[in-house]
């Protein structure tokens, strides 16, 4: 069946109050969108911030009369008589199919492909990782994941052990194993991420070479020839001594999840343990690499 949606322009501080009003008016669902392409990075613990310019999208049944709803919304002090809104008809679609159509095989470097399970593999002779969007972050579409995958594609894995620090979906761990790593250890604070990594390793037939741990369960003497950490700038700074002690002398490091303006500071911080390279950039994001002293 078709639907009707009401789009309202507002700001972050008032979005929740307007959302509550719309639910009372009979909205079937509420969605918040960024109105001006201003993403939010590293919210504090327990915080769910919204954008300064937030678009609220309220969905109603097609025969719903929105005129009285709009009139009542005008009485809200945070909106007023001349608030900006738009009413649109929304056609009924196979939303699951439309969502799936947005994901395609992606190539990273010279030999690595990340392929959704419902797509045909473009190059059966390449290194192919089968991975679907799911519970944990990391499908290759984000610039930080792409930067890490491109770096992993260019490495020699002969007799090498790898640590994926903050493994999320397991995409980097599985890619390293498919590229030839001897063994990979994945560490994450989220049990759901551990389960997602395990499932993706099994799907790609590399589960026997992947060990997964919550931080409190990891071996005390864990060391690697290669460590990749795609998290955020704050945790990268806080965990730097712990990360450094897990890399063997002469071992390789890659850090991502940080913005370009954060790269210089984080690189300087890690330089006490590593000989750091020049950053690599993609869109607004950066990757740092280095060699353990």
Curated annotation (Swiss-Prot):
**Chief location bin:** cytoplasm
- Top enzyme class of this protein? transferase
PANTHER family associated with the record: ELECTRON TRANSFER FLAVOPROTEIN BETA SUBUNIT LYSINE METHYLTRANSFERASE
Which UniProt keywords are given for this protein, alphabetically ordered?
Answer: Cytoplasm, Methyltransferase, S-adenosyl-L-methionine, Transferase
GO MF term (any one)? protein-lysine N-methyltransferase activity
Q: What does this protein do?
A: Methylates ribosomal protein L11.
Q: What is its EC number?
A: 2.1.1.-
Location comes to: Cytoplasm
Q: Which domain of life is it from?
A: Bacteria
**Gene Ontology BP term (one):** methylation
**Sequence similarity:** Belongs to the methyltransferase superfamily. PrmA family.
GO CC annotations on file = cytosol
Per its record, the protein catalyses: L-lysyl-[protein] + 3 S-adenosyl-L-methionine = N(6),N(6),N(6)-trimethyl-L-lysyl-[protein] + 3 S-adenosyl-L-homocysteine + 3 H(+)
Pfam families to which the protein is assigned, alphabetical: PrmA
- Provide the residue positions that the database annotates as binding S-adenosyl-L-methionine: 145, 166, 188, 230
Q: What is this protein called?
A: Ribosomal protein L11 methyltransferase
Gene symbol here is prmA
